[in-house]
Regions:
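Glycine-rich phosphate/pyrophosphate-handling loop used in enzymes and phosphotransfer proteins
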Residues: 1-221
Length: 221
């Protein structure tokens, strides 16, 4: 057996539960990269850790757009997670897409009646990177997913300041007929929740096109 993150040989005595039920098998080193967010201790809006009431950012969004995203973050966006996303997303180590498949699968069970939609890359960004960092992880999970949105080419989010991200223009268009999503529930999935601007844009557009409910799930917060 190999570590689901670094792919090194993993020497581990499996329990009966691990034999019969899927779990992420990570070596000791890789296990330290991911700190799970305790959902009961997270903001009920954006999922910010250690904020059991709506945080200041969510209250500001509520004033600005009239609703609050219901986001769930799986892991802390800390040094360990940043190391993973640097190696996976920016360096392009595609093997790392399976690092937390079991945790992702478990989280998706809470959205059984939702259309799962990974946040898209622009065609130019996809051509440069060679893969969508979100859909590549979702490919290893059980539920099907759908590309409901398309993205225009804009400057990468990682190159923008917080203020610039918050002022970003609507980068998405809906790529399916309205009839396909009208009165549906949609789960938007992204890698990291930073300001929330990207996910808010996606949610706003879906609501404008008749979607009943939009929730979001991010790998890190």
């Amino acid at each position: 057996m190999r570590c689901s993150c670094c792919q090194k040989e993993l020497i581990k005595n499996l329990t009966l539960l691990e034999l019969f039920f899927q779990s992420s098998h990570r070596c000791f080193h890789c296990q330290q990269l991911f700190t799970v967010i305790e959902q009961k201790m997270a903001c009920p809006g954006c999922g910010r850790p250690n904020s059991v009431e709506l945080c200041g950012d969510c209250l500001q969004w509520q004033k600005q757009i009239g609703f609050v995203l219901e986001n769930r973050g799986l892991f802390y966006y800390d040094a360990g997670f940043r190391k993973w996303i640097e190696d996976y997303k920016f360096t392009g180590d595609y093997r790392l897409r399976g690092a937390f498949t079991a945790e992702l699968n478990q989280a998706l069970k809470n959205y059984r009646d939702y259309l799962i939609c990974p946040m898209p890359l622009s065609m130019e960004r996809f051509a440069t990177r060679g893969f969508n960092q979100v859909s590549s992880c979702l490919e290893l999970t059980n539920p099907p997913f759908h590309f409901l949105l398309a993205r225009k080419e804009l400057a990468p989010q990682s190159e923008k300041t917080r203020a610039e991200r918050l002022k970003m223009e609507q980068p998405f268009t809906v790529k399916v007929p309205k009839e396909k999503i009208r009165n549906q529930r949609v789960l938007l999935v992204d890698d990291v929740y930073t300001t929330g601007r990207t996910l808010v844009h996606g949610a706003e557009l879906l609501y404008q096109n008749g979607v009943k409910t939009v929730k979001t799930l991010t790998f890190a917060r």
